[in-house]
Structures are given as C-alpha cells and as structure tokens.
A protein has these predicted regions:
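N-terminal Rossmann-like or analogous alpha/beta NTP/dinucleotide-binding catalytic cores
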Residues: 1-77
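Active-site cores that bind ATP or allylic diphosphates and position pyrophosphate for catalysis
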Residues: 54-178
C-alpha cells in the first residue's frame, strides 16, 4: 500500500526510473548491518546532543527510546551505504549530514581504510533551506501532522483549505477571503 503510493508520487514528480535507483530500505539488509557497525562506534554524548533527539524528547518525554536516540546513525547508514558525496537535504537535516561525515570518518580511521567518502549537502540554491509548516512553527513534513503539509495526493479542495488556513505574517489578504 504505502510503498506503492510513494512510488506513484515519485513518478508523478518526474523521477525517471531509468536514471534513478528506487528501492525499499528494509529490503537491503546491508543497511541494517552498517547501522549496527556504526552504532558500535557512536558515542552516547554525540547522539544525545542531536537537535532532533532533543526536540523529540521535549515533545514526547514518555517515548524516549534507543531507536529515537540512534536514528541519526540509521540516517548515516542510509547515506554512507551508497558512498554518496552529494546528498539533497534541507537545513533541518544539516546536523545529521555532519554526523554521517563523523561516523564515516571514524569507520575509516578504525579500519584504516578510506572506504566512505565525506558526504556534503547538495542544493541548487546558495544555502540550505527549511520549508516551514503550514502552522508557521516547525518544518513542513509528514511527521509534523496531516494538516501541516500539502501532499501530492491531496485533492484541489483540500489543498485550497490548507493554504487558506496556513500561517502567514498576519498582513491582510485581498484575495481568497472565506
């Protein structure tokens, strides 16, 4: 269900399957294996300092678990497994990319090999951006709630309602008054 929906959205956005490798993360056991190796050399302090971890702990203190703590290591494994050097990320993922470089360099030193190149952010603009959510507070994304983002699968009417309710600078609007 969900995998097919995501694939349809990728294709609708113009991703060319002849030029792009599309895969299901859970179908690649090497990612989990690399995650384990990287985890064994990730330090608690650096993981606890992760901005995303601290934000999630503040938002939901009753659900602090190892998966949440080590999520940046999984993201690093996703990047490093491909030996990627250019990674399309937003401003909010910059710290995770820095951690991926740290974990990759640590792995290289430990095994005295330059296997993982350093990954860097790829963007078409001069700086990384963070797309704000419709509520004007956090980022736009599925983890921030159904009504805080516009989805490709949203109907035109749903999109219109979401946009009309979106947080703005508070200035008057001349068009689209309910």
């Amino acid at each position: 269900g969900h995998v097919k929906d995501v694939l349809v959205e990728y294709l609708a956005c113009g991703i060319d399957p002849e030029e792009t490798t599309i895969y299901i993360q859970s179908d690649v056991p090497e990612i989990a294996e690399l995650y384990l190796y990287l985890n064994m050399n990730a330090y608690m302090g650096e993981l606890e300092r992760s901005t995303s971890f601290k934000d999630k702990v503040r938002a939901n203190p009753d659900n602090v678990n190892a998966g949440l703590l080590t999520y940046p290591v999984l993201m690093a494994a996703d990047i490093l497994i491909h030996r990627a050097t250019k990674v399309p990320v937003g401003k909010d993922q910059e710290q995770h990319l820095e951690m991926a470089r740290t974990f990759g360099n640590r792995f290289n030193r430990l095994y005295q090999n330059e296997y993982f190149p350093e990954p860097y952010a790829f963007t078409y603009s001069k700086s990384l951006v963070k797309v704000p959510g419709l509520d004007g507070k956090g980022k736009m994304g599925k983890s921030e709630g159904e009504n805080n983002a516009v989805y490709l699968s949203d109907s035109p009417e749903i999109i219109r309602k979401k946009v009309l309710k979106a947080f703005t600078d508070g200035g008057p609007t001349s068009e689209f008054q309910d």
